[in-house]
From Swiss-Prot:
Lineage: Bacteria, Pseudomonadati, Pseudomonadota, Betaproteobacteria, Burkholderiales
Reactions the enzyme catalyzes: 3-methyl-2-oxobutanoate + acetyl-CoA + H2O = (2S)-2-isopropylmalate + CoA + H(+)
Protein name per UniProt: 2-isopropylmalate synthase
Gene Ontology biological process: L-leucine biosynthetic process
Organism: Acidovorax sp. (strain JS42)
Organism domain of life: Bacteria
Length: 512
C-alpha cells in the first residue's frame, strides 16, 4: 500500500508575484480550470484580502472549480481570514492558508513583534479560521531559518487549535536537500501532536534546488504535500516546478513509493497556457515541458531511440501531453472540430459567445496561415478580446508604411472604453512607430523595460508572440500579443500591457 502525495498549486498566488506576471480575473479562471483538468489537489487561487481584484478572482474560481480544493492566502489576522472565508463561501471544498513569520530576523525587522506575540497571534488566527472553515493550513514564514525550539512551540500550538496542514517554507531558497529533509523530520519527531496534521513543503529556487529540496522534504522529512507552480513560476528565481516534482515522483515510484493524482497528459497544455498568459517563455531545455525535453540531436542517441526508446528516454513525451501530430486544423475545419480541439487542449471558454468569437478569430487566422498548430490555438484563446472581461483598450487595425532610408510611419485604430480612436506616429522602425502612435493618444508615461519576440511554431508562416513589459509607479506588468504580422502582435501586446497597468490594483505583498 502506498501513500498519496498532495499537489498544492500556487501559480495563481505565489507564481503571480513574479514581476510582470499579473493576470486578469478571466485569465486566472482559465488557468484554474486547466489546473482542475490536471487534477491538482489544491489550487491556491490568490490572496483575497490583498485587493478587490484578487477577492473577485478567488470568488470566481471558488464558484467554478468543483473537484479541487480552492484555497486563499491570509495573514494571521481576523480581517484577512474573514475576507478569505467570504471569497471561498461558494467553494465545494475550501481551505484558508494563514501565515506569520517565525524567524528572528523577520520578527524583529519586519513584524517588530516578540516571539510570544507571534505565538499568540498564530494561535488566535488558526482558532478564528477554524470557526469559519474546516480545512486550515498554517505556514511559519521563513520557517527554515527559524529557531527550531520556537518553531516547535508554534506548530504544536496551531495543530492543537485545529490546523490540518503544516507547511514549512524555505522562503528565500536557502536550504540544501539533505539538511531541509532532516529539518522537517526533526520537527515531526519532536512535536507531540505532529501526526494530527499533514506536513507540507514550499521551496523557492534561489540556489536552483527547489525541486530537490521539496523531494527531500518528502522522502527524508515525511511531508505529504508539495507546494509548487506551473513552469516553476514565481518571484526571484521561482518556485518548485509542478511538472518536475510530479514526474520525478511518478518516474521514480520505485524510490518514493508514492502515488500522485495528477493527469500528466495535461501538463504541456498547462505549461503553454501559463507561458502564453504571463509572457514568461519556457526555456527550450526546461525539464518535461521545454521544446527540447524529448529531442535527440546526437546520432548515437537518435539511433538508440529508434531501436528502443528506453535507451535514452525515461518517460514518454505523450505521457506529459506532447502530441506527435502537431498540425490539427486548417481553413476548412468547422466549428465543432475547433470546439473539440479546445476541449482536448484543456481550454474551456465561459460561454457560447466566447466560443463564437474565438472561432471567428480562428477562421481569420486560417485565411492567412495554412497550418494551424496547438500553439496557435492557445495563443488565440489567450487574446483578451476573446473573453467576456471588459478591457479599456482593444486592438482594431493597423497600417504602416516603411521604405529604405525613410522613417517608418504607423497608423493604429484601437478602442478606448468601447470607442474607436485613430492615432499616427513616426518611429525608428515600424514596431516603434506603432507603439508611439498608441502613446500619442494614451499618454500613459509607462517605461518599457522588456520587448521580446518568440515564434509560436517553426515555419516562416508562424505567428509571432510578442511580450511587452511596462513599468509605471512601481508596478510592473507583462502584455502578450500574437499575430503572423510582428508589428500587429507588438501593438496587441502593448495594449494588453496597458490594460493590465490600468486594472492592476495595489496589492499587499505576500511572501512565503
Amino acid at each position: 500500500m502506498t501513500d498519496k502525495l498532495i499537489i498544492f498549486d500556487t501559480t495563481l498566488r505565489d507564481g503571480e508575484q513574479s514581476p510582470g506576471a499579473s493576470m486578469t480575473r478571466d485569465e486566472k479562471l482559465r488557468i484554474a480550470r486547466q489546473l482542475e483538468r490536471l487534477r491538482v489537489d489544491v489550487i491556491e487561487a490568490g490572496f483575497a484580502a490583498s485587493s478587490n481584484g484578487d477577492f473577485e478572482s478567488v470568488q470566481a474560481i471558488a464558484r467554478a472549480v468543483k473537484d479541487s480544493t480552492v484555497c486563499s492566502l491570509a495573514r494571521a489576522n481576523d480581517r484577512d481570514i474573514a475576507r478569505a472565508a467570504e471569497a471561498l463561501k461558494e467553494a465545494n471544498r475550501a481551505r484558508i492558508h494563514t501565515f506569520i513569520a517565525t524567524s528572528a530576523l523577520h520578527m524583529e525587522k519586519k513584524l517588530r513583534m516578540t516571539p510570544e506575540q507571534v505565538l499568540e497571534q498564530a494561535r488566535q488566527a488558526v482558532r478564528f479560521a477554524r470557526n469559519l472553515v474546516e480545512d486550515i493550513e498554517f505556514s511559519p514564514e521563513d520557517g527554515y531559518r527559524s529557531d527550531p525550539d520556537f518553531l516547535c512551540r508554534v506548530i504544536e500550538t496551531v495543530i492543537a487549535e485545529g490546523a490540518t496542514t503544516i507547511n514549512v517554507p524555505d522562503t528565500v531558497g536557502y536550504a540544501i536537500p539533505e539538511l531541509y529533509g532532516n529539518f522537517i523530520k526533526n520537527l515531526r519527531e519532536r512535536i507531540p501532536n505532529s501526526d494530527k496534521a499533514i506536513w507540507s513543503v514550499h521551496c523557492h529556487n534561489d540556489l536552483g534546488m527547489a525541486v530537490a529540496n521539496s523531494l527531500a522534504g518528502v522522502k527524508i522529512g515525511g511531508a505529504r504535500q508539495v507546494e509548487c507552480t506551473i513552469n516553476g513560476l514565481g518571484e526571484r528565481a521561482g518556485n518548485c516546478s509542478l511538472e518536475e516534482v510530479v514526474m520525478a515522483v511518478k518516474t521514480r515510484r520505485d524510490y518514493f513509493g508514492l502515488d500522485v493524482g495528477i493527469d500528466t497528459q495535461h501538463i504541456v497544455a498547462a505549461s503553454r497556457m501559463v507561458s502564453q498568459t504571463t509572457g514568461f517563455v519556457v526555456q527550450p531545455n526546461k525539464a518535461v515541458v521545454g521544446a527540447n525535453a524529448f529531442a535527440h540531436a546526437s546520432g548515437i542517441h537518435q539511433d538508440g531511440v529508434l531501436k528502443a526508446r528506453d535507451t535514452y528516454e525515461i518517460m514518454r513525451a505523450e505521457d506529459v501531453g506532447w502530441s506527435a501530430n502537431k498540425i490539427v486544423l486548417g481553413k476548412l475545419s468547422g466549428r465543432n472540430a475547433f470546439k473539440q480541439r479546445l476541449q482536448e487542449l484543456g481550454v474551456q471558454l465561459e460561454s457560447e459567445g466566447e466560443i463564437n468569437v474565438a472561432f471567428a478569430k480562428f477562421k481569420e487566422l486560417a485565411d492567412r496561415k495554412s497550418e494551424i498548430f496547438d500553439e496557435d490555438i492557445l495563443a488565440l484563446v489567450s487574446d483578451e478580446s476573446v473573453t467576456s472581461e471588459k478591457e479599456q483598450f482593444g486592438f482594431v487595425s493597423l497600417a504602416q508604411h516603411s521604405e529604405t532610408g525613410e522613417r517608418p510611419e504607423a497608423t493604429i485604430v484601437f478602442t478606448v472604453d468601447g470607442k474607436e480612436v485613430r492615432s499616427s506616429s513616426e518611429g525608428n522602425g515600424p514596431v516603434d512607430a506603432s507603439m508611439k502612435a498608441i502613446e500619442a493618444h494614451v499618454r500613459s508615461g509607462a517605461e518599457m523595460v522588456l520587448y521580446s519576440v518568440n515564434a509560436i511554431s517553426g515555419s516562416t508562416e508562424s505567428q509571432g508572440e510578442v511580450t511587452v513589459r511596462l513599468q509605471s509607479a512601481g508596478r510592473v506588468v507583462n502584455g502578450v500579443g500574437a499575430d503572423p504580422d510582428i508589428v500587429v502582435a507588438s501593438a496587441k501586446a502593448y495594449l494588453s500591457a496597458l490594460n493590465k497597468l490600468q486594472s492592476k490594483a495595489e496589492r499587499v505583498a505576500a511572501q512565503g
